[in-house]
Design a protein with these regions (language model features):
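C-terminal, loop-rich substrate-recognition/catalytic regions characterized by aromatic stacking residues
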Residues: 282, 291-520
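Short beta-strand/loop turn elements enriched in aromatics
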Residues: 36-39, 222, 374, 432
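Short, polar/charged, Gly/Pro-enriched helix-capping and turn/loop motifs at alpha-helix termini
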Residues: 20, 27-28, 160, 313-317, ...
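N-terminal export leaders
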Residues: 10-14
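N-terminal secretory signal peptides
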Residues: 1-8, 19-26
Length: 520
């Protein structure tokens, strides 16, 4: 078979055939969507009520079952004299985290809830801040400590015994992990930008170590530089740091705050798909971190509505109007803003499969069989022309909305005994500039799972199914959907495989890209 090398400047000339949204995108032109994003009008997100209390802080030690303790700050409603108000109030573990440097920030943010009648606890995980021990992020020990913290707060004489937990990133991870441990007094959680599985989301993406986490490891938990490297396969070490392995135990009401640009969007969506009867999903136009600092439409009022409902016993406090509240990115401008759906992917979404073709195009019709090849990039620089394959659709005459995950099913032969496949989707503008939409990665020896490596026989064709993380993204008319296939995607994954060549089957009986799309 002929081997064709593709370059970044290669453009397609073929139109897309077949049914579905992309076919319509190549039909007669239609008017563009109205300028400006759809606003978030659901009353849940504008909920608020007046503050009634002041705030008093107590520096405490939370006792643990093994005789150790955790340092924490307990913020309680205060009366007019500045003393703790008489009565009992529901409790929120506002952050259970290893980020001791942020304690004052957390305390200031927690005060919003304290002034409205909640106790709020900011807790330093074992080995962080003033808590003795060694940080072992999201470990079974840390989960036991978190369980003990919730039960301690429930027994506090100023608490009703109804406890919630919330947090961003580290605190979001701990919120989900403690929930599947089922402490008796935990009633609901709000995890923001959080995991479903520490191995898959963060450390070994598709079985490939992610270098972007190493600086975090060095600064937060240096011992993990050795322990994580010692567990390249999915074993009990990782099962103990996973929500996924215990999805059946995620039974408390869960308000997931996800970002479509966030590094944990795949995990947040997977949690929802696994437990749709217990999870409400909010996915917005933000990256990793606190959404309130990136987007003015998400504030503490929505969280207060959640706590008033599940901890305060107010059955009139609103819930989100739909199970899924999602911002169609990019925006403002290209994306249409907020939408609400009863499920994810949306009910009107459907799968569309495109073929990777010899001329560098993506189309529903596969065309002739063939091969294309690229060289393995063993460095950290972006791949050059010979180290990647590029495929793209024709220019779209109508908008196309991606609403869900995607899968690259690739037939590949490796000249070495292992290899990596990185699949990156881009929005290509008429001037040729590309905007990254989403991506997925897979080590060839992990093509049958991460628990046991599968042999990679040099020169033999292997079928790999690369999961591409979900998105809710509008590709505008006049743009193209572009797919880059290579061995690297630094800093998302390490370039950790031997030098060599990867040959990819294209055209009929070759590689395909399955998309989830909805009508624009």
């Amino acid at each position: 078979m002929e081997i064709t090398e593709f370059t970044p400047s290669r453009r397609t000339v073929c139109a897309l055939a077949g049914a579905g949204a992309l076919t319509a995108a190549l039909g007669p032109a239609r008017a563009a969507v109205a300028a400006g994003p759809t606003p978030l009008t659901d009353p849940f997100f504008s909920y608020d009520r007046p503050a009634r209390y002041g705030v008093v802080r107590e520096d405490i030690k939370v006792p643990l079952r093994d005789g150790s303790h955790l340092a924490a700050q307990l913020y309680r409603p205060a009366d007019a004299t500045g003393k703790a108000a008489v009565g009992r109030f529901p409790g929120i573990v506002y952050e259970f985290t290893a980020y001791a440097a942020n304690l004052e920030y957390f305390g200031d943010a927690a005060a919003y809830f304290v002034r409205r009648g909640y106790n709020a606890l900011v807790c330093q995980a074992r080995g962080s801040g003033a808590s003795p021990g060694t940080v072992d992020p999201f470990s079974p020990q840390e989960q036991r400590d978190n369980h003990d913290t919730i039960e301690w707060l429930a027994r506090h004489p100023g608490c009703t015994g109804d406890i919630g937990q919330m947090g961003v990133s580290y605190g979001g991870h701990t919120s989900l992990l403690v929930a599947v441990n089922r402490p008796p007094h935990l009633k609901a959680i709000i995890p923001t930008n959080a995991l479903h599985d520490w191995y898959e989301n963060t450390i070994y993406r598709g079985g490939i170590y992610s270098p972007r986490i190493r600086d975090w490891q060095r600064s937060t938990a240096p011992a993990t530089l050795q322990t994580y490297a010692a567990h390249p396969l999915y074993d009990d070490f990782w099962r103990g740091r996973s929500v996924m392995t215990r999805w059946d135990r995620l039974t408390v009401p869960t308000l997931e705050i996800n970002g479509w640009y966030d590094r944990y969007r795949d995990g947040m969506v997977k949690n929802f798909l696994a437990r749709p009867e217990h999870v409400w999903l909010v996915s917005g136009p933000w990256d990793h971190g606190d959404p309130a600092t990136q987007y003015a439409g998400i504030g503490p009022g929505a969280y207060l509505a959640w706590w008033d409902r599940w901890l305060g016993g107010d059955r009139h406090a609103p819930l989100p109007a739909a199970r899924v509240t999602s911002y169609e990115i990019p925006g403002p401008g290209a994306g249409t803003g907020w939408h609400q759906f009863d499920q994810w992917p949306p009910r009107d979404a459907h799968s569309l499969t495109l073929s990777l073709r010899r001329d560098g195009s993506l189309a529903a019709a596969p065309a002739a069989s063939g091969e294309a090849a690229f060289e393995v990039n063993t460095g950290t620089a972006a791949p050059n022309a010979g180290q990647q394959l590029l495929f793209s659709t024709a220019e779209l005459r109508r908008d196309v909305v991606l609403a869900g995950d995607a899968t690259l099913t690739v037939r590949a032969a490796f000249s070495a005994s292992d290899g990596n496949i990185a699949a990156v989707l881009h929005d290509e503008a008429p001037d040729g500039t590309r905007t990254r939409i989403t991506a997925g990665w897979l080590k060839a020896s992990h093509r049958h799972g991460h628990t046991e490596p599968a042999p990679v026989i040099p020169g033999t064709c292997h079928d790999l199914s690369v999961h591409i993380w979900p998105t809710h993204y509008r590709i505008a008319a006049g743009h193209r959907l572009a797919l880059r296939v290579s061995s690297d995607d630094y800093p998302e994954i390490d370039s950790d495989v031997p030098a060599g060549r990867v040959t990819v089957g294209v055209g009929a009986r070759g590689s395909t890209l399955r998309l989830t799309v909805r009508n624009p």
